Amino acid sequence: MPLLTPTSVVLGVLLSQFLNGYEWAVPWIFAFITFAGSLSANFQSLRHALSHPLPMILALFVLHIFMPLFAWGSGHLIFKGDPLTITGLTLAVVIPTGITSLIWAAMYKGNVGLTLSIILVDTVLSPLIVPLSLSLLAGAQVHMDVWGMMKGLIVMVVIPSFLGMLFNQMSSPERTAFVSSALSPFSKLCLMAVIAINSSAIAPYFKSIDLRFAGIAVTVFFIALTGYAAAWLIGKMMKRRQEEIVSLIFTGGMRNISAGAVLAVTFFPSQVAVPVVIGMLFQQILAALFGYMLNRFELKPMLQKA
């Protein structure tokens, strides 16, 4: 994953003249990706998390209160007078948590049920939270098609997630595992296609990299890093169990950034998409970095105590 995203961005920029015009297909391709990623979820995990809500509330606080305000404030501090860049920075963090956070949480002994539940609840709420957050933080400065964004999120994220969960619920574990493994390679290829098409839409910005572009990249990296760190700190402050902290780190730090890029390209001027696409470059790299830090500072001490 850390190599897949930058490779797709580079291909999108280099092949922009061939990929431009295919933006219409992206929401449907992304709906397939969401369906494939949701096959591991079911309604029981959601019910369990709702009966023990504190870890989920902490994750949603990081995702939709702390990080949007932090990104919005950072944008106004660093890019004052540039509402499109500020909106892009904000959009990159108001979108729901990423499905791939489940992979990272499982890899580092996180609470898989909690991670799934955070993904599901955040996904279901996203058609309301994303437009509302952007309207409150950037609505006065940038024209937005709020209803269009809500419909886009419902088609790309909510309906495919529900269908994936329904398939899991109504099928045997063996059949679900078979379908999930069969769709996995196609899902990765589709993700590459989505990233490449979205990157092609902002190719001119990547082809003329200057100090301003570098400043946006550094800011995006710092904001993304803060999401992981804030989730870790809040988990420790609230004295959560180790597996819950791992889940909080990856759900709080990762975003469904490809969905954010689709929204940026579809509903905003291309400049808004620049911070979002840059965020795609850093997300998996930062996940790997925090996985290493977890092994060093969180998981090893627990193993030594045992």
From Swiss-Prot:
Q: What is its main location?
A: membrane
Keywords noted in UniProt: Cell membrane, Membrane, Transmembrane, Transmembrane helix
Q: How does it sit in the membrane?
A: Multi-pass membrane protein
Q: Which cysteines are joined by disulfide bonds?
A: none
Its annotated compartments are:
Cell membrane
Gene3D superfamilies for this protein: 1.20.1530.20
Is Cell membrane set as a keyword in this record? Answer: yes
**What stretches pass through the bilayer?**
13-33, 53-73, 86-106, 112-132, 147-167, 177-197, 214-234, 246-268, 272-294
InterPro entries this protein is in? BilAc:Na_symport/Acr3 (IPR002657), Bilac:Na_transpt (IPR004710), Na+/solute_symporter_sf (IPR038770)
| The keyword Transmembrane is assigned to this record | yes
Protein name, as recorded? Uncharacterized protein YbaS
- Which organism is this entry from? Bacillus subtilis (strain 168)
